[in-house]
Regions:
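N-terminal secretory signal peptides that target proteins for export/translocation
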Residues: 1-12
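Bacterial N-terminal signal peptides
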Residues: 17-30
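Aromatic- and Gly/Pro-enriched helix-to-coil junctions and flexible linker segments
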Residues: 31-189, 197-200, 209, 240-251, ...
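Solvent-exposed, flexible loop/coil segments flanking beta-strands in beta-rich domains
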Residues: 141-202, 255-320, 376-397
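Noncatalytic modules at the cell exterior or secretory-pathway interfaces
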Residues: 191-192, 234-254, 358-374
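Beta-strand signatures of extracellular beta-sandwich domains
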Residues: 195, 206-210, 325-327
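Beta-sandwich interaction modules
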Residues: 219-239, 345-362
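Extended, compositionally biased non-globular segments
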Residues: 314-386
């Protein structure tokens, strides 16, 4: 019950920090849908047909759609459960700050791949969910929406499938598979973005694409776009480069007894060589092992030995954190914020491309400060855990 006691305070905080993400992969809900009270008072001025469906379609429809990655569709009012069956869970997720899974704090540096649900639209959904979930004008015929199994950024310049199918058998809910994929390039290629086409959309939970012995090309989550780095930056793949693909699988409850076979495909988007001739490199700063003390703020640091332009950051977390801040500290003592996160959970790792890259000199100290969150709070329950690390995407000087 302590989680519910904090919902009101979190709701106020969400609205004051201005925006909340709309890329809703995941209302991964701990509770199941319950029956709807037909006699519940309809106090909301907003209805599903007029106000709520367009918001859910445009902001959550990549995942919460029939055949999509999420275990339920929110794009019907009551068909097969529909949004009305999940209204209470939607409310809980929004008030807890647990969903949508986007954690960039707008008081920090702006990030490129941001999809926001503005406070007004957030308020509409919460008001509808708590105000009797009215259906609205029944003469409005809503369009049928199905999952689009295609490339969000258009057909890639090169598609590289997994070398062999991977099977997750019955009664196996989670698994991981790591493979190498040769590019067979006869010359160097410059890559501006990388995407993934999941073989089984309902099961491919996340993926990491990197160059063997080189930079991280993509941190992929369902519903994400393939976003270009800022200021024309790009990755360089040498002739004969080999890619490493790691895919994490997580079945929904509907598929627990099924044997599912995945053959995901990497998509590469090429570009011209940047004017600088410099390629994005990956630098990692490892945190302490063992997990945080729930009552004590955590901090660690590393050094950017070679100067460069920071174009992106990739936090990997070992626990939920109420706040995460990455700061560059120059030899003079001057501090520059690189990234701020709020209510961040480890099961949603992301790459945050900066809107405005930040130039740092050699031997800049990188400080990371974290305020622990409650690993068991809220509708999501206990979080997954990964090794604590902050990845930096750097274009060398």
């Amino acid at each position: 019950m302590k989680a519910f006691a904090r919902f009101g305070a979190r709701h106020a905080r969400v609205l004051t920090w201005g925006s909340i993400t709309a890329v809703t992969l995941g209302l991964v809900l701990a509770s199941t849908a319950t029956g709807v009270d037909a006699h519940k008072a309809k106090t909301s001025p907003f209805s599903y047909n007029v106000d709520i469906f367009p918001l859910l379609r445009d902001n959550c429809g990549r995942c919460h759609v029939d055949g999509g990655p999420a275990p339920m569709s929110l794009l019907t009012y009551d068909q097969d459960g529909g949004a009305i069956a999940w209204a209470e869970s939607i409310r809980e997720m929004l008030l807890a700050g647990a969903m949508p899974p986007w954690y960039a704090d707008p008081t920090g540096p702006a990030v490129r791949n941001n999809h926001n649900l503005n406070p007004r639209d957030l308020d509409k959904i919460i008001t509808w969910a708590t105000g009797g979930t009215p259906h609205g004008d029944l003469t409005i015929k809503l369009p049928a929406v199905t999952y689009r199994h295609d490339w969000a950024a258009g057909k890639p310049d090169l598609e590289l499938p997994m070398p062999r199918p991977y099977t997750v058998g019955p009664n196996v809910m989670q698994a991981s598979n790591e493979v190498t994929i040769p590019t067979n390039f006869t010359e160097a290629k410059w890559v501006k973005s990388v995407d993934l086409m999941p073989g089984v959309a309902s099961m491919v939970r996340r993926a990491y694409v990197s160059v063997e012995g080189g930079p991280v090309l993509a941190v992929w989550e369902p519903g994400d776009d393939a976003v270009d780095p800022p200021s024309g930056a790009a990755f360089k793949l040498a002739a004969g480069a080999t890619l490493r693909l790691k895919v994490d699988y997580k079945k929904s409850w509907q598929d627990e007894q099924k044997s599912l076979v995945d053959t995901s495909v990497i998509g590469l988007y090429f570009t011209e060589e940047p004017l600088s001739g410099k390629a994005i490199a990956s630098v990692s700063i490892d945190g302490p092992k063992g997990g945080p003390d729930a009552a004590v703020p955590l901090s660690f640091s590393g050094t950017l030995k070679n100067g460069g332009r920071i174009v992106g950051l990739r936090p990997m977390l070992d626990s939920p954190y109420a706040s995460v801040e990455v700061t560059a500290v120059a030899a003079s003592g001057r501090k520059v914020s690189l990234l701020k996160l709020r209510n961040a959970r480890p099961e949603w790792p992301r790459r945050y491309w900066l809107v405005d890259p930040i130039e740092l000199p050699a031997n800049t100290k990188i400080e990371v400060t974290l305020e622990p969150g409650d690993p068991d709070i809220g509708p999501l329950g206990k979080a997954e855990s990964f090794a604590l690390q902050i990845g930096l995407d750097v274009v060398p000087q």
